[in-house]
Amino acid sequence: MSNIKKAIAILAGISVYASAHAVPVFYSGTGNYYEYVSDSVLSTEAQAAAAANSYLGATGYLATILDAGENTFITNLISNAAWIGLSDATTEGQWQWVDGPEAGDLAMYTNWSAGEPNDFASGEDYTEIRTNGTWNDHGIPHFTNYRHGYVVEYSPVPAPATLALLGIGMAGFGFIRKKHLTKN
């Protein structure tokens, strides 16, 4: 009987871990992969946590949402409000992407909730996407204890570039080997 209880406990633990760290999902609209991480973190911690993840050789970053289709896709991934990579911490009122290929770019597409962004109490510099797909400015510096999950985006190296990098690496290896053989 105790072996059955141990097995059930192990399976329950695996289930909890798997739900918090799901396999990233591919979105054909961007060619990227996305992952909702339900770990409860501060807005400023979410960026570092996303960068600590990788998938298919690509380093993660907080999701950048460039159109309504991508917004809908991400909305369907999340089960609670989640941090995305949009911030005006650098320049108040200038909402720009903090990571990924769009880092530093001003947001051209937004889906703010009515009355947002409002910089409530002069301190909402980060963006959460809600389960209805609308966005809210929130987080640090004013709300120092506001925590929730985040959406990680992965931009894998395109296949042709991967093959080119492999070819360059093989050529370099061949050159070094040839140079080494001629010395001996």
Stretch-by-stretch model annotation:
Residues 6, 70, 162:
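Residue-level recognition of oxygen-bearing side chains
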Residues 180-184:
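Short, charged juxtamembrane terminal tails flanking transmembrane helices
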Residues 158-177:
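A short, hydrophobic C-terminal helix/tail in secreted or cell-surface proteins
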Residues 21-156:
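Extracellular, disulfide-bonded carbohydrate-recognition/adhesion ectodomains
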Residues 13-14:
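Short, linear, compositionally biased motifs with a strong N-terminal bias
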Residues 1-8:
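Bacterial N-terminal signal peptides that target proteins for export
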